[in-house]
Amino acid sequence: MKILKFGGKSLDNGSGILTVLDIIIDNYRAGEAPVVVVSARGKSTDALLALAEQACAGESYEAALQAFWEHQCQDTTLRFEAERVQLERLLSGISLLGECSPRTADELVSYGEVLSSQYVAQALKDRGYEAVAIDSGDFLVTDAHYGSASVFTEASRERCRALFAGLPAGVIPIVTGFIARDEAGRRTTLGRNGSNYSAALLANFLEASLMENYTHVDGIYTANPSVVAEARKIDELYYADAAELSQ
């Protein structure tokens, strides 16, 4: 078994998502039994937070919400009817109260990952492969520290193994990164780099042979190439130096 984790920009509409699908299919055909972990696609998380800000301020958010759904539904047969209703209800509540608590914010941003997993699963089905979208909140159990929750590892491990043991043979699981639920079933998120953490936990729980983390850049750079034009790719790097750079 291999864990394949894909970042948000690599999952965006266009050539990015097509490359992701090719990687998943290649691994499946090679007999790697891939388990896929996905972030929210593109700038979905930023768009959801912007919607919350508009709703909090009592501003009209309908046009921005429509643009959000147009982006999510591009190049897919999915229309996310249930999620549309749920998200509209959530934004209406934020607008009515004029605030977005950390708990509500976790519920709101979770839609980015939920929609992403469904999108990728459907895209694989359209290409003739059996795939299933899995909400990591169905097995990741955390405390109630909304925005940066801590995982209860043993409880999560037990739930994870039970869930995956029940999946049909040959199906490709598409798992949400970043999101979980507390012991009361309320939505939580794992904070910065939460999707990578989710993937690492999954690799540990399922005793995967390997975890591969895919991003939209082709290596480690001296700075963020999206921000610093002069950033250079580092050809060779010791593990200790990589760990230092990640801090």
Which functions belong to the PLM regions below?
Residues 1-247:
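Nucleotide/pyrophosphate-binding catalytic subdomain
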